[in-house]
Amino acid sequence: MSVTRISRESLNDILAGNAREAATCVLKFYSNSCHMCQSLHEYYIHISDNEKYKDLHFFAFNVDDDPEIEASLNFKGVPTIFVVHSHIGNRPATLRLLPDPEDPNEVTWYKVRDIKAFIDKEAL
């Protein structure tokens, strides 16, 4: 599966339970000015293409499009990754935040193995 850039309106629909179907999503928040976000980009795409994750939806949201998103979802800084379990029927989504790494990668912040382990634990 590929990564889809998501709008604030679509993100709001997922979070509020206004999605067309219940789904599990992996959501990366990034900024165009963040060098670590740019370095993580290809790895995130590669993870999304893994057959193991074929039933998951991978999204990316540019925080430059809505600077208030960090406060509304209670995270600080990018890149940031969530697993989101969306529901239907106006039932709010369940969000799980990938914790900041104890030993961050100096180029990408997160390590690929940590992202995969997080997805395996929270989404599969």
Where are these regions (language model features)?
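Thiol-based oxidoreductase modules, predominantly thioredoxin-like and allied folds used
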Residues: 4-8, 29-31, 41, 45-68, ...
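A short beta-strand-turn-helix
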Residues: 4-24
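Non-catalytic, surface beta->alpha helical segment in thiol-disulfide oxidoreductase systems
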Residues: 83-124
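Structural micro-motif
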Residues: 67, 73-85
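Beta-strand elements of modular eukaryotic interaction domains
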Residues: 15-18, 48-49, 68-73
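Short cysteine clusters
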Residues: 34-37
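Short, solvent-exposed loop/turn segments that connect beta-strands within catalytic domains
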Residues: 19-23, 54, 87-94
